[in-house]
């Protein structure tokens, strides 16, 4: 495992990317939105210590029930993954990443809705929301004009917003295992 970590460090160095991977590999989990704990309950990572130049932040497979985006001062963040946690709602502070975020992965949580602020992420190209409890998507979703990939599989969606037809760059829409009766018309 140490060799793999070294390889990731070398890859990040070679490509100029800075990745902070806070996914537990030892059974650890997050107990609150501010730090992650190791398997013994000790603090393993304090999010305020995350390098401000980080472009990728991976917080998958923890037990986060909430996540306050204002605690992160990451203006260069391109990829944020919070998959496989216990998030029930998304903090509207997500809009603070509007100038940089291109990939947002939130699958396998307990999200019931998304704040309208999600639609302010104008550079977003990939949005994964599968395996949640979403009953609807924001009406303004069509404002994500750069969106290429949208996954909303395994939710409770009865309809997709009509503005979805405005996503002219959308290459992949995956909406399997929902309660859909019709698709919005293309515009």
Question: Which positions does each model-derived feature cover?
Answer:
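The feature captures the LRR N-terminal capping module
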Residues: 1-131, 135-139, 148-153, 159-162, ...
